[in-house]
């Protein structure tokens, strides 16, 4: 594929899990040190993945409940979702299946989801857990289990602060759109054929 294709990629997840930081880290190679709820503008860039040039449109969303009615407006036309949770927040991990998957299936059925665990740098930071005794780390195994539970084609852990795996998140999102995983459901449909005698 040599022609440029537009891919709309929308980030979703609880407030303060690091969606905006992930986008800023990816697009500008910098890490914002202060938490400012969703100020990232839509961004577009030409990216080459596996020899294919795509125009990647990045859309940020607000995770806070105040935006529950407005947020789905950005889902229209999405090619892929990046569903983020914090690797140091059990609540954000649990909300993936409790809140976000039902919302995405309702407003954007069939759109692939890349599951992303953010704040990887803090998961092994002992001082962080001393300072935040209520924080619960999420393991890679738990992330992989959640990926299977929600049927996501990819799960990636990253750190916007250290930039570890940040590019990998967006490369995975592009790959999921350009090379969708093979669907296993086709065999099931053939087995469920109706016979009238």
From Swiss-Prot:
Any single GO BP term: small GTPase-mediated signal transduction
Propeptide: 195-197
Cysteine methyl ester found at: 194
GO molecular function terms noted in the UniProt entry: GTP binding; GTPase activity
Residues with lipidation of kind S-geranylgeranyl cysteine: 194
Family note: Belongs to the small GTPase superfamily. Rho family.
Protein name in the entry: Rac-like GTP-binding protein ARAC6
Gene source species: Arabidopsis thaliana
